[in-house]
Amino acid sequence: NLARDVANVVIRDDDLATLSDAVAQGRAVYRNIRRALEFLITTNMSEIAVGIVEAAHGPGELETPMELLWINLVSDVLPGLGLALADPDADVLDRPPRPAGEPIIPPDHGRRMALDSGTIAAATLASHFVGLARYGPGPETRTMTFLSLSLGQLLYTLFCQRSDIRDLRPGR
C-alpha cells in the first residue's frame, strides 16, 4: 500500500499495455491542446488585424455584430473543438518525449503563428480592397471580407490538423 501512495503511476491491472496507452493518450491530449491554442490564437490575431485595418480605413467598413458572432462561433469554436478532440496520431509513441520545461507554445511556433495570422489577414484584406474597388463600401464588400476571413480560418484548421504538412514549411 505504501508503494501506491508514493508512486507517480499506479497500474490497476497486470497489463503493461495500459501504461503505453496512457502515455499515448497523454501525448495526444497535449498535442491537441497545443494545436487548438495555436489555431485560436492565430485566427483571432488575423481577425484583430483585419478589424484594425478596416477601422482605420473608414467606419462603414467593419463587419456587423452578427458576422463577427458567426465567425467566432462557427470558424473559431467548432474547428477548435475538432482540433482539441482529435484522435492520437499513429506515430505518437515513436516521437521522443518533449523537454520538461518546454512551454505549451514554443517561440518558433509563435513566430510561425504570427506569419500564418498575417497571411490570413493579408488574403482577407486583399479581398476587402478588391471589393471596395469593385463595389465601394457596403454589403457586397463586407460579404467578400466576411467570406474570405471565414474560409481562410476554416482552411487553416486543416493546416493545423496535419503535422506532416506543418513540417514542410520553411524553417522547420
Regions found by a protein language model. Name each.
Residues L2-L168:
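Membrane-embedded transport module
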